Amino acid sequence: MGKKSRVKTQKSGTGATATVSPKEILNLTSELLQKCSSPAPGPGKEWEEYVQIRTLVEKIRKKQKGLSVTFDGKREDYFPDLMKWASENGASVEGFEMVNFKEEGFGLRATRDIKAEELFLWVPRKLLMTVESAKNSVLGPLYSQDRILQAMGNIALAFHLLCERASPNSFWQPYIQTLPSEYDTPLYFEEDEVRYLQSTQAIHDVFSQYKNTARQYAYFYKVIQTHPHANKLPLKDSFTYEDYRWAVSSVMTRQNQIPTEDGSRVTLALIPLWDMCNHTNGLITTGYNLEDDRCECVALQDFRAGEQIYIFYGTRSNAEFVIHSGFFFDNNSHDRVKIKLGVSKSDRLYAMKAEVLARAGIPTSSVFALHFTEPPISAQLLAFLRVFCMTEEELKEHLLGDSAIDRIFTLGNSEFPVSWDNEVKLWTFLEDRASLLLKTYKTTIEEDKSVLKNHDLSVRAKMAIKLRLGEKEILEKAVKSAAVNREYYRQQMEEKAPLPKYEESNLGLLESSVGDSRLPLVLRNLEEEAGVQDALNIREAISKAKATENGLVNGENSIPNGTRSENESLNQESKRAVEDAKGSSSDSTAGVKE
């Protein structure tokens, strides 16, 4: 969105002439592809691998300097052309203007009073860059032959963007010319800036994003140079790493899912004008109207003339914002830290615990989240920890007898403990685990706060330090919360307080004709609030009834900018890992839906 550009926007119109030969770059990219396709490094070796990959990438960037396609002037010089183009093609352009909000970057400012829930912005399909428009473009022949482009719409969209940027007469030039020339995603971080993220929970995703992007570039460089269907692509003679990083970041920070024209499925899209809106806390207020075939956005709240118009991107953590959007949101009520937990197969009760978890729809090993808000754990994590800490007798109670299914229903409900002893154990475990994670950081909370007072820090360095500080603060709160809960349940146990009795009327159950197939609503989607679908995530802005009528892609946890659930992310990454093992042509865009 507008916030992504804090740097000078280079513009010129054509690529410069470089002396480096395609064969020389081909040799370097082959080396890069081999390095990026090697097995994952062992514990403690990720940084070393990152530096090695980065060294190769920088060598390629240096040799390609001057080859990239750029434009003349500043980004904002093209805003009038964008508004004119949008207006001529049926988009709304009244009631707002594009303005530089300094720290937040460019955004939309109201030029009149706008009421909450008022429809103020709409963008018809013809203005959107989509996977479908990519298929029908000069990229089409290569798309029809390359299985990576076919399988990963985000990569297809990135190449679509590159091809159109290199085509002076492209229909989308008025839009493309207003995109930032650089972003603040970790793909653009200097090595010293990435170093600030060492020991954080987010660093693994940063490494993965960088490695996957480098691997994709190396693979596609060879495709562009050797595939017969790539001969007519306008980027054939100037496909640089810098170009690919830019395209990937443009897509990563902006893409969303919209319905196809017949409404039968979804497709990825870039949405001009709308993608200038910056983020604030709130609710999803963007939808897709199939009847009018356009993206629509209603006001999140009342906006007076002269105020910035915000939208809600969704329930993203700050790690997701930094890695995928290139900014840190200071007042993020949805911030959280990933925590990997699993039942050891060496546990003598493993089989029983695995069965109880399976009945609750929870895997024996997964990535959960510790939340900034109270309570620090979700119903899914509570259920997992309860099973993790169960005795053999408690496990039997959840597996055998007429009341077993009822006990499964209560696993994620804090009002119905398995036992006081079980609660003491799980909160003790969580306290210890969060404490151990805190000790892995190389700096303290106080030291981070002190460093942030240094005005010489770059914007990206500040983001990195804020991110690691935020992680520590969440972990510290989790430790304190766990300690309070531990003592409360210990007191209940010492006083031999009676356990609350479960009654079916206490919980909402999913309707089903087969009793044993019912699952408690609270456990149905693992860590549902930890992330959301990679979709245009559009909640009905006015009413659910109208949403159904208009054919909007809805979802309470859906958000703009291509976020997805942690479970979905893990599943997709697993599939990608399998594909990567098959050969160099299997590649992915980590975090660039993503």
UniProtKB/Swiss-Prot annotation:
| Any one GO CC term of the record | chromatin
What residues does S-adenosyl-L-methionine bind to? 75, 104-106, 254, 275-279, 325-327
Answer yes or no on keyword Nucleus. Answer: yes
The protein's matches in InterPro entries, at most eight in alphabetical order, are given as: Rubisco_LSMT_subst-bd, Rubisco_LSMT_subst-bd_sf, SET_dom, SET_dom_sf, SETD3, SETD3_SET, SETD3_SETD6_MTase
Q: Where is the composition biased (Polar residues)?
A: 10-20, 555-572, 583-594
Keyword vocabulary terms for this entry: Actin-binding, Cytoplasm, Methyltransferase, Nucleus, Phosphoprotein, S-adenosyl-L-methionine, Transferase, Ubl conjugation
| Disulphide-bonded residues | none
Function, please? Protein-histidine N-methyltransferase that specifically mediates 3-methylhistidine (tele-methylhistidine) methylation of actin at 'His-73'. Histidine methylation of actin is required for smooth muscle contraction of the laboring uterus during delivery. Does not have protein-lysine N-methyltransferase activity and probably only catalyzes histidine methylation of actin.
| UniProt family annotation | Belongs to the class V-like SAM-binding methyltransferase superfamily. SETD3 actin-histidine methyltransferase family.
Fill in the subunit field for this protein: Interacts with MYOD1.
Q: What is this protein called?
A: Actin-histidine N-methyltransferase
Q: Which organism is it from?
A: Homo sapiens (Human)
